């Protein structure tokens, strides 16, 4: 699959790196992420000025705008060689549940993907004992289940993205 990855924690975040590392083993991965932290920016888009996009390495770009700007830029410009089959946002530092979803740039990027007609999933990792570890465990879960998760994203009728939240544990017993 051709997958576009982004987030709201910024290009250098541990969650994005873990997700990219796992998914690139089986899929074509393209990354465009904010050049800095844009947490809680919601569905903001940049108006009245151009976003700066910088190629960091092959198939990896930073953008001076918001997570939604990243998705729009990737889809509306000519930087991607192909339209992605799915958009993945995260892995976010901290959960995105309840009203958090309204403020979350992570969720907004996935929402924008669905608006553009592409199945999308947001991933978030919740702190345990004030620690945030094990991004690789959630990234591994994402890699093993990405096809199923993207099938649950309804881009036609309901216009919904999938929002995955997990505790920062060294392993998972299952899902619900």
Where are these predicted regions, by residue range?
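A cross-family phosphate/adenosyl-ligand binding-site feature
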Residues: 3, 13-77, 81-83
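Active-site metal-binding loops of divalent metal-dependent hydrolases
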Residues: 9
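Hydrophobic/aromatic beta-strand patches that form the interior of the parallel beta-sheet core
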Residues: 30-32, 61, 88, 119-123, ...
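Glycine-rich beta-alpha junction loops
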Residues: 36, 127, 166-170
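Glycine/threonine-rich flexible loop motifs
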Residues: 95-104
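Hydrophobic/aromatic ligand-binding patch that stacks against planar heteroaromatic rings
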Residues: 109-113
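Glycine-rich phosphate/pyrophosphate-binding loops
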Residues: 114-137
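Electrostatically charged, flexible surface regions
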Residues: 135-176
